[in-house]
């Protein structure tokens, strides 16, 4: 049976078979760190772009899990590997090490570090996680200055409190989504075909509540991921605790 015929034969609630491997996904992560923390050499741009883009394409054809939590981690990896390609391909002739540094450190600090050493690996990982370049030489515009600082302990206590709040709200929104979008008219949970999912309702109040629930789901899930990353990064010393670093258009609860 061809791939197209097989796909069309699936109903909306059927899951694709997990006949792939997690290896390309892990290699994709490793390749980004490898090329950023490795030496600068002729052909680095071409080799890095070819390797990362090839692994990204191969990873798309390797379904290794139907667990939404695990799959979500790798499904959201695309901005990170795109960022790695951009920073290497469009770097100056001396490489990204000459362009990217933390504003409170010595400029071009990574150029003096041993390749694949701990400091350069940590620099590469921090660079990949900090997509908006907060406190880096490539920081995005319109980030407000926040002179107030927190100690590591204060920051971790504050963020852990935020994480508890977000986890509670995530659980509440998840239960609301199950009730609104995955429960049929008879009250059976999980039997509703996804093609019938809609925020429309004959009663405008319920329609508004469904739309709010649909929007709050990604909001709290993404906030939860940012909080966990910020807690781990500060706890391990990869990042420094900062009170504020987000543009005003985003919630002040969301770490960067």
UniProtKB/Swiss-Prot annotation:
Superkingdom classification of source: Eukaryota
Record's bilayer topology term: Multi-pass membrane protein
Pathway(s) served: Mycotoxin biosynthesis
Membrane-crossing residue ranges in chain numbering: 21-41, 163-183, 214-234
Compartments in which it is found: Membrane
Gene Ontology cellular-component annotations: membrane
The entry's keywords: Glycoprotein, Membrane, Transmembrane, Transmembrane helix
Glycosylation site list: 19
Role summary: Part of the gene cluster that mediates the biosynthesis of aspirochlorine (or antibiotic A30641), an unusual halogenated spiro compound with distinctive antifungal properties due to selective inhibition of protein biosynthesis, and which is also active against bacteria, viruses, and murine tumor cells. The non-ribosomal peptide synthetase (NRPS) aclP is responsible the formation of the diketopiperazine (DKP) core from the condensation of 2 phenylalanine residues.
Protein name: Aspirochlorine biosynthesis protein F
Organism: Aspergillus oryzae (strain ATCC 42149 / RIB 40) (Yellow koji mold)
Organism lineage: Eukaryota, Fungi, Dikarya, Ascomycota, Pezizomycotina
């Amino acid at each position: 049976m061809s791939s197209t015929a097989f796909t069309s034969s699936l109903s909306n609630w059927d899951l694709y078979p997990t006949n792939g491997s997690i290896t390309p996904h892990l290699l994709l992560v490793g390749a980004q760190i490898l090329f950023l923390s490795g030496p600068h050499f002729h052909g680095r741009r071409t080799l890095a772009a070819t390797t990362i883009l090839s692994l990204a394409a191969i990873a798309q054809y390797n379904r290794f899990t139907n667990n939404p939590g695990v799959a979500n981690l790798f499904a959201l990896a695309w901005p990170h590997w795109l960022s790695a390609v951009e920073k290497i391909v469009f770097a100056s002739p001396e490489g990204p090490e000459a362009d990217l540094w933390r504003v409170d450190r010595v400029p071009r600090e990574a150029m003096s570090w041993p390749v694949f050493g701990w400091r350069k690996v940590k620099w590469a990982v921090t660079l990949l996680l900090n997509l908006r370049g907060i406190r880096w030489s490539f920081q995005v515009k319109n980030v407000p200055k926040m002179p107030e600082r927190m100690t590591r302990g204060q920051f971790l206590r504050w963020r852990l409190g935020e994480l508890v709040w977000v986890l509670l709200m995530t659980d509440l929104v998840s239960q609301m989504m199950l009730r609104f979008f995955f429960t049929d008219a008879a009250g059976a949970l999980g039997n509703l075909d996804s093609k019938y999912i809609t925020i429309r309702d004959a009663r405008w109040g319920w329609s508004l509540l469904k739309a709010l629930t649909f929007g709050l789901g990604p909001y709290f899930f993404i906030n939860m991921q940012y909080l966990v990353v910020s807690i781990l990064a500060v706890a391990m010393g990869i990042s420094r605790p900062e009170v504020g670093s987000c543009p005003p258009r985003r919630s002040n609860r969301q770490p960067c």
